[in-house]
């Protein structure tokens, strides 16, 4: 039974890894309110109003999520000077929040982490499998989604980051941005 479920999940991940939207069908992301780890309320548009963002959804029990987040932290540092940000949304229940805070503090992530225990945004964006990454333009439209994580996916995400930075800027230097390396880190 486990093998059947695992096979079905892999088949779903392979078929749904990259979903790009044409301009005519781009959807606006709902502007929901979340709490950060200091219990401060923040709205989603505060993050994308100054540049494009990558939103990743995760839980503490999702090992692929945690592997992906290491790479997202590096990409956030690398591309933040271009107005790009990574925003992480944890969907664990409030009773595990202390463990989530301890984990994120130990990892020293370079991006903001918000809490959405009801998985409201995840569901509104059609999420069903984690990790889920959603690229959002600075006008609030959803550029693309990536479902699941396999070693090497960080290179695909980096290319998408460069594309979204370039398409959201008129600066010719930014439009010619290239990955600094094609290095793939296998863990």
What are these regions (language model features)?
Residues 2-11:
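Bacterial N-terminal signal peptides
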Residues 44-63:
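Short active-site neighborhood of thiol/selenol oxidoreductases, capturing the structured segment around
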Residues 54-55, 86, 133:
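Hydrophobic beta-strand anchors of alpha/beta hydrolase catalytic cores
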Residues 66-107, 117-123:
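Structural microenvironment flanking redox-active thiols in thiol-disulfide oxidoreductases
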Residues 102-109, 117-162:
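Thiol/disulfide oxidoreductase modules built on the thioredoxin-like
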Residues 166-187:
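Non-globular targeting/processing and membrane-anchoring segments
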């Amino acid at each position: 039974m486990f093998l059947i479920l695992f096979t079905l999940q892999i088949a779903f991940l392979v078929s749904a890894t990259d979903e790009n939207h044409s301009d005519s069908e781009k959807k606006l992301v709902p502007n929901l309110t979340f709490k950060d780890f200091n219990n401060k309320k923040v709205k989603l548009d505060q993050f994308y109003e100054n540049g494009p963002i990558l939103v990743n959804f995760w839980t503490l029990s999702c090992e692929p999520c945690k592997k992906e987040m290491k790479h997202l932290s590096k990409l956030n540092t690398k591309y933040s000077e271009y107005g790009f940000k990574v925003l992480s949304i944890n969907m664990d229940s409030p009773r595990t929040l202390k463990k989530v805070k301890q984990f994120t503090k130990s990892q020293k992530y370079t991006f903001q982490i918000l809490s959405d225990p009801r998985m409201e945004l995840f569901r509104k964006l059609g999420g069903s499998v984690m990790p889920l990454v959603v690229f959002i333009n600075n006008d609030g439209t959803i550029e693309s989604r990536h479902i699941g994580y396999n070693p090497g996916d960080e290179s695909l995400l980096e290319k998408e980051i460069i594309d979204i930075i370039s398409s959201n800027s008129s600066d010719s230097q930014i439009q010619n941005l290239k990955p600094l390396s094609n290095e793939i880190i296998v863990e």
